[in-house]
Structure formats: C-alpha cells, structure tokens
Amino acid sequence: MSAIQLVNQGRQTFRFDTFGDESFWGGTLMLHQAIEGAKLGGVGPGVSPKAALGVGLKVDVDALPANLIAALNHGKVNLDDPATTLALLQLNAVVGVTGFFNSSGTLQSVGIQCALCHSTVDNSMPDLCAGAIQPNPGTGCIGHRLDGWSNRDLNVGAIISLAPDLSVLANLLSTDQATVRTVLGTWGPGKFDAELVLDGKAFNPQQMTDGAVTGTNIPGATLIPPAFGLGGVNLHTWSGWGSVPHWNAFVANLEMHGKGRFWDPRLNNAAQFPIAAAHGFGDLPHIDPDSDVITSKLQALQFYQLAIPSPQPAAGSFNAAAASRGDALFSGKARCNNCHVEPLWTDAGWNLHTASEICIDDFQANRAPDQRYRTSPIGDLFTHFKGGFYHDGRFATLNDVVDHYNACLSLGLTASEKSDLIQYLLSLTFGPKNSTPQSGQMSSGSNEQ
C-alpha cells in the first residue's frame, strides 16, 4: 500500500469508522432514542440541531447539498426540530457521529468516531452559532472540517447524560445512575475522563499549584488534546500512557467500546486500577480476527494522524518582533527548551516528569502507569485556547502559565520578558522552525486533502 493510500485509508477511519461501537452507544446506552425524541419514536424531547450545537457537536458543510446550504443561510431550516438532526445524520454530516437507520427512517442506533473529540469545523458560517454556543476561537458550528483540532466545545459528559440507560456505567462504578449523571455534569466543555472507568476516581480532592491549594474536589476530567503535531513524539496523553497506536487501541476498545483486541498488563494493577483489574480490561477476550474491526486499522490511522498538517496562526495574531525576543528567552533565561525541545516542543525521548518538577499535585499523574506528567507539545496553541491550559485547565491564560513557571523555577522574568515569551508561544507551529518568527501567513484552514 502506498503512502497516499495509507493517508486516505487513515482519514476514512479517523472521520467515519465507529469500530462497531454502535452496539454500545445505541444498543446499550440507547442514546439514539434520546436523539430522536418521543415524537419520532424515541424518548424525551429529542435533540434539535441547536441543542446539538449547544453541546459542541459540529456539522460538516461539505456533506450538505447546495440547496440545504442556501436554506441555512436564509434561515429557512428549523434548527429547533429533532427531525432536522435526523436529516443531518442521514447525510452523514454530523462530525464524529454516525446514525444507523431503519427502513422506516427512524434511528436504529448511533455510533461515534475519533473525529468526535479530535475534529472541529471552521467558522465559515459564523451566524449559525448564534443562540447555540460561543465556539473555541477560530472554529465554528457548521463549516469545513478541521481534522486533528481538539473540540474544546464538546461537552462529552452532557452528551452521555442524554442516554436513557446508564446502568452499565453505574454498575461498573458501583454506584447509581443519578450519581453517574452528577459526575458527568461536572466535566464541562472540552473535557473527558478516560481513567474514570479504570480507577473510579471522579474528583481531585486537593489541587496544588506552586505549593498552595488552588482548589478542592476538582473534576477528574482532562482537556481534550489535539491529534496533530504527533510526529517524533514518544509518549501520548497528558500522563504518557503510551504511543499513539497504543492510545488509539485503548480508546477504540475501552472508551468507544468498539470490537477489537487489547492488551496492557499494567491495567492488572488492582491497587492503581481497581475497576480495570476486576473487569479484565488489560487483556480483553480474544476474538476471531474477522470480528476484530480495530486492530487492522491502527496502522493507517496513525499514519493519517502523523500526516495532518500543522495549522498556521492567522496573520497579525502575534507580534513578530516580540516573538523574536521571546525566542531567545525560550532557549535561554526562561529555560523552556530544556523540556519543550524544538521543533517537537516536547522532550526528545522519554517525555515524562514528576509532579514535583513542575510544582503541581500528582493526582492525575498517579492515574497513569508511570505516575508522571508528559511534557505536552506546545505547537499551535492558538487552536485550543478555550478551557485553559494544563491537563485540567487550571491556568486560564498563557500569562498564568508563564507566571507559574516563573515562580516554580525561580526564573526572575520581568513583565516585558513575559510578554515577549507569550508572543513567541503564540507563533509556534509543528515542523521545521523558521529562522525568524513571522506574524502569521493564514487563518485556520481545512484539512481536506
């Protein structure tokens, strides 16, 4: 298979493959019934397009016929009617979600894809967000796909809570459905707790930053990271669970509930992962290769993720002269380059550090096998401003991040040096470094290839 064929196959998997998980999201949770609503054969009020956009779901404008686009632009489409949502699902236009329909036109089931969390759309139709959501800067509600961008508008907890039957999750967590819904309601936009079904720890009892308590009972959900800029990066996720294909297999099997084979004996550690150990998540039952619809797709999926181009900052989005001064600080006085090594923007090698090294609590680190935090690649920060920075979003702005490291590492940065450093951070993209930071060549573009 050629490289082009691998990219195309991986893109198809990333955007449209449910890995058979509709048997869970529809068959077990009955989420499709909540989407269509009682009037259309389901339960409850149903999910209108406006409600769907309000929880961060996106619509791919390239999947819409021209007459529908024209009607949308003229306000002639009822965005308050769940029937319109079903029509969009029939067009395969809802990013990251596939509807499976009966011959009568009612929903039979629903499944999700990688793109649900790791894609969004551009703001080419900005008026259609009105009354639904204020999207992450540079993105929209209905537009062209932006693969690899973290969907910081997506309220995963709210979406799961729509499901009529959460008994499987309640039983797994040894609690009741009401408690599960309460926990899901704490996540908020742009966050997901992948470890909850492994350890049952829904809240960080005491958040510590620079030696001070900065919060108590903080939700354990972490920010959804981008799925681009992964070339040359060793360990993936906020706490370095493993490589990109390891995490793809982990998520496809254990989080999306697709049909495949997964092996990670570290999950047999009952002291650290009591739920995972009790349910054999570290060694999923062997299945017939013809029934495994995940493993054969991991190669192309990783290949596509590595091929997703680095978005470029919008023209004028940072001060080039200040960024040039910040460049010198980054590799000098500020010592950022000690860990965020150019041009990977993470450590070249085993990219993990203890909580004490970065002056924060170890709650999230202790939920991963190595009990450390990964040095996050910091290219293209402009693509995910919403929700804050660090794994739990504890720092609202880049100013807060720089202030934190200034205190943690006793850097002695002046106000002007901090400002220059931030301008440099705003200029960073993945790939070969320009000799002089440019002020931006283009706004965000589609990853159509």
Task: Label each region the model flagged.
Residues 1-449:
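Periplasmic c-type cytochrome electron-transfer domains
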